[in-house]
Amino acid sequence: MNINATLIGQSVAFFIFVIFCMKFVWPPVIAALHERQKKIADGLDAASRAARDLELAQEKAGQQLREAKAQAAEIIEQAKKRGTQIVDEARETARVEADRVKAQAQAEIEQELNGVKDALRAQLGSLAVNGAEKILGATIDQNAHAELVNKLAAEI
């Protein structure tokens, strides 16, 4: 194998080509590789942050759901209590109204009973006077004996 000038010329050209590539071609390629590496790292970081954010959002959504369920249960409990209270108030109002109607009816019955008793006393007094007239066969003075009849009616 002979080393001749062509081989040396080719070696020099090759070294010049390598130096040229290292000086002008290699830096943009390295910069592109670093930029691509940075984009990939940023993408992985963003994915990691997104996964953490997703976990936090799911946890927060679960917490809000639990709070909403608890609040709904509390509202339902309050509604049940209010419903029971309304029913109790209605029962109490109905009982008071029934007592009032009962008392009013009792008073009306008492009043009518007293009226009937007074009417019966008056009729009894009149019957007693008529009976005494028939027994005695003579007319009895109504004015003179009205006081006697009233006393008799009051005793009855």
From Swiss-Prot:
InterPro entries: ATP_synth_B-like_membr_sf, ATP_synth_b/b'su_bac/chlpt, ATP_synth_F0_bsu_bac, ATP_synthase_B_chain
Transmembrane parts of this sequence: 12-32
A GO cellular component annotation in the UniProt record: plasma membrane
A GO term, aspect molecular function: proton-transporting ATPase activity, rotational mechanism
Superkingdom of this protein's organism: Bacteria
SUPFAM superfamilies, per the entry: F1F0 ATP synthase subunit B, membrane domain (SSF81573)
Disulphide linkage map: none
Main function: F(1)F(0) ATP synthase produces ATP from ADP in the presence of a proton or sodium gradient. F-type ATPases consist of two structural domains, F(1) containing the extramembraneous catalytic core and F(0) containing the membrane proton channel, linked together by a central stalk and a peripheral stalk. During catalysis, ATP synthesis in the catalytic domain of F(1) is coupled via a rotary mechanism of the central stalk subunits to proton translocation.
Family membership noted in the UniProt record: Belongs to the ATPase B chain family.
Full protein name: ATP synthase subunit b
Gene name tied to this protein: atpF
